[in-house]
Amino acid sequence: MSREKITVVVPVRKGSQRVKNKNFKPFADSNLLKIKLDVLKQVDVIDEIVVNTDSNIAMEIADEYDVSKCIREDYYASSECNNSEFFQNIAENTDTDYIIYSPCTAPLIKVDTYYDFINRFRNAKDRCDSLTTVTDVKQHLWLDGKPMNYKPSDS
């Protein structure tokens, strides 16, 4: 029985809205995309790395790193496309059993973290079909002028 295929999709949008060309700006003697690919190439249980992009620069970097490319259609790179449509498009255009979505805007994820995540998923596949990362927040949170996770009168 063969092992199920794991593909990492690294989304890279040409038209960054808040910080122009953020994925290619100098960062730690490299750039965000190269840092992400450097880490992912060290994780030997990943079967394929796909740079999903509308950027010629990202495609050149994908070639430099010998990883796959998926040319993103303009609509899916626009701010008009919602997250549900975007993720559906990735799923429909990625030939794999499992997708790890790993934006290059999270450059500090370590090799060991990917191994840990993949192992946790493999060990939980009978109970779940996806995993996501979360952060334990131990602060009082407010939304629209109202407390979300506590009662001020009890504090």
Give, region by region, the residue ranges found by the protein language model.
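Short, polar loop motifs at secondary-structure junctions
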Residues: 53-58, 136-138
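Histidine-centered beta-alpha loop that forms part of the nucleotide-sugar donor binding/catalytic region
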Residues: 13, 74, 103, 135-136
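Short phosphate-binding loop-to-helix
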Residues: 56-100, 108, 112-116
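Conserved core of the sugar-phosphate nucleotidyltransferase
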Residues: 85-86, 98, 107-155
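Short helix-capping segments at alpha-helix termini
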Residues: 41-45, 95, 123-125
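N-terminal glycine-rich phosphate-binding loop and ensuing alpha1 helix
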Residues: 3-52
